From Swiss-Prot:
It holds the Pfam family BORG_CEP. It is found in: Mitochondrion. Coiled coil: none annotated. One of its GO terms (cellular component) is mitochondrion. It comes from Mus musculus. Residues 1-11 form a transit peptide. This is Uncharacterized protein C15orf62 homolog, mitochondrial. Residues 29-48 are annotated as: Disordered. Keywords: Mitochondrion, Transit peptide.
Length: 175
C-alpha cells in the first residue's frame, strides 16, 4: 500500500514538486548555461541574470519560449517564405521534358518498342502454325426448340434493337 501512495497522483508532494519547482529550475538552467559557455571556450563570465536576459529577449526581437512564458508562439516571428518558382521562369528547370542531349543519347542505345514488336509477332505466328488448332465451338442451331433466351428491355431499347435487326437481316420477316 505504501508503494502505491508513493507514485500516486494523490500524493501532495507530487503536486508541490510540479508547481514549486519551476522558478528554481529556471535559475538552475541559467547557471548551467553560464558554466557551459565558459567550459566551451568562451572565456567571459556570465551571471544568472545575464543568461536569463539573453534567453528571454534577443537583440533581433525574437524570444525563446521559456517555461514561465504564457504565450510563446505569439512572440516568435514566422520564418521568411521561400521564393516561388514559376514554370516560365528561367530559374526553374523544365523537368517534364528531357533535354535534346538526353533523348539523343538514350534513343541510340535502347531499342524502341516498335522495333521489338516485329520479331515478337513473327515468332508467335510461327509457333501458332506448328501447334494443332483447337476445334471451334459449333454455331447454335436456331431451329433447336431447347435454345431460347429472354431479354427484358425497355420499350425504347427494344425498338432500337428491332430496327438494327431489320437493317442487318432484311430478308427475315419475323422480327
Amino acid at each position: 500500500m505504501e508503494t502505491w501512495r508513493k507514485g500516486s497522483f494523490r500524493n501532495a508532494s507530487f503536486f508541490k514538486r510540479i508547481t514549486l519547482g519551476r522558478p528554481r529550475r529556471l535559475h538552475r538552467q541559467g547557471s548551467i548555461l553560464s558554466q557551459a559557455s565558459t567550459a566551451g571556450g568562451d572565456h567571459e563570465e556570465y551571471s544568472n541574470r545575464e543568461v536569463i536576459r539573453e534567453l528571454q529577449g534577443r537583440p533581433d526581437g525574437r524570444r525563446l519560449p521559456l517555461w514561465g512564458d504564457e504565450h510563446p508562439r505569439a512572440t516568435l516571428l514566422a520564418p521568411p517564405k521561400p521564393p516561388r518558382l514559376y514554370r516560365e521562369s528561367s530559374s526553374c528547370p523544365n523537368i517534364l521534358e528531357p533535354p535534346a542531349s538526353y533523348t539523343a543519347g538514350y534513343s541510340a542505345t535502347l531499342p524502341s518498342a516498335i522495333s521489338l514488336t516485329g520479331p515478337l509477332h513473327q515468332c508467335s505466328e510461327e509457333a501458332l502454325s506448328d501447334t494443332p488448332h483447337f476445334p471451334r465451338t459449333p454455331t447454335p442451331d436456331l431451329s433447336d426448340p431447347f435454345l431460347s433466351f429472354k431479354v427484358d428491355l425497355g420499350l425504347s431499347l427494344l425498338e432500337e434493337v428491332l430496327q438494327i435487326l431489320k437493317e442487318q437481316f432484311p430478308s427475315e420477316p419475323h422480327f
